[in-house]
Amino acid sequence: MSLLKMEYNLYAELKKMTCGQPLSLFNEDGDFVEVEPGSSFKFLIPKGFYASPSVKTSLVFETLTTTDNKITSINPTNAPKLYPLQRKVVSEVVSNMRKMIESKRPLYITLHLACGFGKTITTCYLMATHGRKTVICVPNKMLIHQWKTQVEAVGLEHKISIDGVSSLLKELKTQSPDVLIVVSRHLTNDAFCKYINKHYDLFILDESHTYNLMNNTAVTRFLAYYPPMMCYFLTATPRPANRIYCNSIINIAKLSDLKKTIYAVDSFFEPYSTDNIRHMVKRLDGPSNKYHIYTEKLLSVDEPRNQLILNTLVEEFKSGTINRILVITKLREHMVLFYKRLLDLFGPEVVFIGDAQNRRTPDMVKSIKELNRFIFVSTLFYSGTGLDIPSLDSLFICSAVINNMQIEQLLGRVCRETELLDRTVYVFPNTSIKEIKYMIGNFMQRIISLSVDKLGFKQESYRKHQESDPTSVCTTSSREERVLNRIFNSQNR
């Protein structure tokens, strides 16, 4: 730990990383506060900030030669086989680590690798290469299984803890496994933080973008007060301000053979309203809609739009065009609505729900990985980051209010490399609720633009459904409407 006065150059360097956000750190009294320029307080500067050689410092940091927390169960023959690009990452990491050790810099690296790159297996290879006792920290239980599978494949002795940290501490008094896989809420326990700081050298923070380290969270406090000897942040979408805690980044671009298509399923709707809708519309401009809660609530009861989504999914699934579908909503009640209707159509052997309130959901996710055809309905919160179903070939985005980081993570769910190359995303830019029509169009255009400009998707118009079912709610009723539809499409590309 280093308590320093906030001199101008130090403040400028830290503030630059926040990209306009307030800069918040722990002060000498242990309070987590916003840092003001010229402050007379001393602040706890995160160890990982000094990982970059561009940061000038006279501080000298410990190296691995000062500890003896070595893995005992390592077997070199169990090292996973890597693709050439993954081996390139390993080579870059090893090279950077050598330079850090020579210059006595903290061994902290962010692995900024695309969704589907294989961050888990690459990191397990690095873990075995370092041969140091490791803590793997995940944001939720759903990510445990993919780490468990890879750690077991490497043959490392490990312990998984997802519930009570107190019972884990009792077990650690008599045994000290080479690898601990834990959920991040364990870091709220100071005794546990002290234990892993003393007995484990490598700390892996999976899905690091899910933590805002400018907030006073358990992870923030751990990295500030109990900084590990070595640390990896893993993410496909780095949060800029988090770089203050891990200021060295390796980013290797990944070329893909996947054929990625995004369809904007357009339709003209007659205005639709109910007493409930009229009540919620009144709240659109109020403080209760600060985070667009009522915007999403209105979408969840937009019956014509919901029916269009169902009609499109049913037709595509029945035709065999898509086979392993992820349906994403923002709100739980919206998820349940789609689940019940799809369950009535296809039955429980095909339709599954990814419900955060159901403790059996992680086991269910494991079971559907081997299915050739399924429909998995879930929320952005539960399945938008880290969902490990590599065989997914299609995504239906039913919500609209999604930030860029969430969009990239969500689209990454269908960008895992498998032998099947076609990937399809469906978005629905129209609504029958006139008060949010333009807002929804703008939000959906952001999803389309990011998918095309950054993630390599190709946008195509979706006409099949409208032409094949003239009686459905999504049909256009006249030639004039069809012409207007084409004009609208051209303006929004």
Swiss-Prot record:
Annotated Gene Ontology cellular component terms: virion component
Location(s), subcellular: Virion
Renumbered ranges of motif DESH box: 206-209
Organism: Vaccinia virus (strain Western Reserve) (VACV)
Top enzyme class: hydrolase
An annotated Gene Ontology molecular function: DNA binding
Lineage, broadest ranks: Viruses, Varidnaviria, Bamfordvirae, Nucleocytoviricota, Pokkesviricetes
Annotated protein name in UniProt: Transcript termination protein OPG145
Purpose of the protein: DNA helicase which seems to act as a postreplicative transcription termination factor. Involved in ATP-dependent release of nascent RNA. Forms a stable complex with single-stranded DNA, and to a lesser extent RNA.
Encoding gene per record: OPG145
Gene3D superfamilies: P-loop containing nucleotide triphosphate hydrolases (3.40.50.300)
Family: Belongs to the helicase family. Poxviruses subfamily.
Record EC number: 3.6.4.-
